[in-house]
Amino acid sequence: MNKGDESLGTGLLYLIATPIGNLADISHRAKETLAACDLIACEDTRVTAKLLAHIGAKVPTTSYREENERRKAPELADRIERGEKIGLVSDAGFPAISDPGFRLVRECRRRKLPVVPVPGPNAAITALAVSGLPTDKFLYLGFLPNKSAGRCKVLEQWKDFPGSLIIYESKYRVEKALADMENVLGPDRNLCIAREITKIHETFNIGKISDLKTSFAEKSGKGEFVLVVGPEGYVL
């Protein structure tokens, strides 16, 4: 355990990054921190149970999801105030980034309780780094709205941003999102479609939106996606 963590001498909240696909990517510090927690708050207890079994840690877990976050945040903060060390994880990546966690972190900050990050894998930054698109300036949009009108409104708002746009999309909506991107951003924008990062079927497809939309429609759309869009006029 990091000496700085132990020296706090009180309850605290750990934000612990977990692998985004390949369990071998978990850090030594993350393993130590998970094992030292009194309780782990997680999106899906079944997913976290597999991770804990993989690292050989036996720690109780509690469900912390979008549906119960408003209720659980103050309850967990109460436990931290009583001296417990609680770890917060998402199913994959860093908690509170397009995943539950913001309300618990905010509650801890309001109460002046320590919040300690344990950094690690992040799908958005990984996809950006390998895309070949500009990395000096970027805007993370997270998940776009479910409906086309909402997606188009967000894309229209940021289409002139002078850097790369990073978008998460589910396998159920990615084809529709690509169609909206072509309509709003134009067919010639450069795009990277990152799928199943660090997993067996990892792929990175890079090209113009129009070309990738056509080729994507001819292939299986299974997996988890990060879309990185280059700025207007950028030539790959």
Protein language model regions, located:
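Glycine-rich, flexible N-terminal cofactor/catalytic loop recognition
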Residues: 2-66
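A contiguous loop/helix-start segment that scaffolds small-molecule binding in enzyme catalytic cores
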Residues: 10, 85, 164-236
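Short active-site oxyanion
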Residues: 34-40, 113-116, 164-165
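Alpha-helix capping/helix-boundary segments
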Residues: 46-48, 93-94, 123, 173, ...
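Conserved helicase motor
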Residues: 63-70, 144-148
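Glycine/small-residue-rich loop that forms an oxyanion/phosphate-binding "nest" at active or ligand-binding sites
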Residues: 65, 73-122
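Class I SAM-dependent methyltransferase SAM-binding "motif I" and its flanking Rossmann-like core
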Residues: 103-161
